[in-house]
Amino acid sequence: MKVSFTATDFQAVLVEFQQQTGTTCHLSGHENTLTLPKTLGEGRVRSINLREGIFDLFVHQHRLDESLLIAAASRSPASSPVVLKFFVSGLVDGAIQGIKADVNAVAGQYCFVYCADQASHVEFVAGKDICTVEIVMTPQLFQDMLGDDQQMSQFQQWFNPHKLKPYWKLGKTSPSMAIALQQILH
């Protein structure tokens, strides 16, 4: 199944996803829970708003009966989030215009990604238990968090707010990260 988004606001994306898939949504304060329809498989996606409009935590836990391709249209750099995504189980493939390498990851890896104004897509592969945890923030919040820390110079060189371009960095989840992920999940 393919789902395409044209909206950039999370609430509008949520409505588009519900309309295209038949997913049900439960809202409770700062937390949204999407329950996947049986036609897709089973599982849910939780989103927790940590800071209104600029900082969210997403937890994907599902097993799909058919692969799900989610495509996002090009958007302004200011509305394209900076994402730190951890892969706890399963396989995820994707592509971002402007990045030559395949964008894919398996359990035990994490990625740091920014799509800038480029279109992108991600495919959640059927037949596998997929569990991911992602931290999503605005470019401005990310820049504010970097501050003047010299240890963050790699990101500061890439993260020029006037010349933002797509970025993808894959790494191995450390034991400390894995413990934190388990605490988030349980």
Model-derived features: positions:
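Mixed-charge, polar/low-complexity N-terminal
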Residues: 29-31, 36-37, 43-44, 87, ...
